[in-house]
Amino acid sequence: MTVLIHVLGSDIPHHNRTVLRFFNDALAATSGHAREFMVAGKDDGLSDSCPALSVQFFPGKKSLAEAVIAKAKANRQQRFFFHGQFNPKLWLALLSGGIKPSQFFWHIWGADLYELSSGLRYKLFYPLRRLAQKRVGCVFATRGDLSFFAKTHPKVRGELLYFPTRMDPSLNTMANDRQREGKMTILVGNSGDRSNEHIAALRAVHQQFGDTVKVVVPMGYPPNNEAYIEEVRQAGLELFSEENLQVLSEKLEFDAYLTLLRQCDLGYFIFARQQGIGTLCLLIQAGIPCVLNRENPFWQDMTEQHLPVLFTTDDLNEDIVREAQRQLASVDKNTIAFFSPNYLQGWQRALAIATGEVA
């Protein structure tokens, strides 16, 4: 049988590296359909760090899309597993027949599902993408995203699957010894990307708690973001005293990021779509509750796993946050479906579906 090809169609180094390492470490040894990749972006040592994989790199979205389309047309038995997507040319190829529905399997990462950009180019493209998405062979996504997708594409098959967040399962049972009293520390956003709506989030936190909490804003990723970081910092200083505002402009290594998260009492995420699952997982693992926008469908996944969820529309205070911490501490984190290694079973099933081994 023709080997399944995995496609990382946009140059998002952090996520692409996570996916490649997960496949190299957890899937490649047991499945021949977990080894072939086409990636938009630079190698930057990925080939050396993922020796179990065969990875072909392309300088950009356009060249990658052209190569995928050529392979799809040359062999209609060739199947592709698209991780995230973010590549307009591939959507247009699916819509026009360059890639057939039977060749197209898509793991939704969030951004290609929601229509949040206001630019004219995007508004013109969204209806075409919506039509193309009706032709996907099967989508894989979180419970919330599956529900969202099914509202407009009820005939497309959907299967539960979680992004392979880098986690250490041994930390699931580690007690968080942080003092749960006194001034609270609140994490705002999961990166420096504008989709986090940092300024609106800072205003919302201030409206709920005033200048009585310490706010930490991680903005070290993406790079070359200095102007926006300064914009957020100045907006924050209009709301919070200097001692209560910490805007991080440097990218943190994983262990340092983990240490930062464990110093927090609450995560605050105002964005209205599913994103930042990795940060949510690490916070939950550390016993730290999260505030979500009610429009963010990931709350469905959290409640399905019996996790407490706070919403941006709730009246929040320290007592409510402490109660959510208590509830979270009582959850057996080894049973959470979107934690490592539990999500591995979903990936094994996804490969079987994409290759036709499971109907």
From Swiss-Prot:
One of its GO terms (cellular component) is plasma membrane. Its EC number is 2.4.1.325. It is found in: Cell inner membrane. Belongs to the glycosyltransferase 56 family. Pfam families: Glyco_transf_56. This is TDP-N-acetylfucosamine:lipid II N-acetylfucosaminyltransferase. Signal peptide: none annotated. It catalyses: beta-D-ManNAcA-(1->4)-alpha-D-GlcNAc-di-trans,octa-cis-undecaprenyl diphosphate + dTDP-4-acetamido-4,6-dideoxy-alpha-D-galactose = alpha-D-FucNAc4-(1->4)-beta-D-ManNAcA-(1->4)-D-GlcNAc-undecaprenyl diphosphate + dTDP + H(+). InterPro entries: WecF. It is an enzyme of class 2 (transferase). It comes from Escherichia coli O81 (strain ED1a). GO terms for biological process: enterobacterial common antigen biosynthetic process; fucosylation. It comes from the Bacteria. Pathway: Bacterial outer membrane biogenesis; enterobacterial common antigen biosynthesis. Keywords: Cell inner membrane, Cell membrane, Glycosyltransferase, Membrane, Transferase. Its main location: membrane. GO terms for molecular function: 4-acetamido-4,6-dideoxy-D-galactose transferase activity; fucosyltransferase activity. Catalyzes the synthesis of Und-PP-GlcNAc-ManNAcA-Fuc4NAc (Lipid III), the third lipid-linked intermediate involved in ECA synthesis. It is a peripheral membrane protein. The gene is wecF.
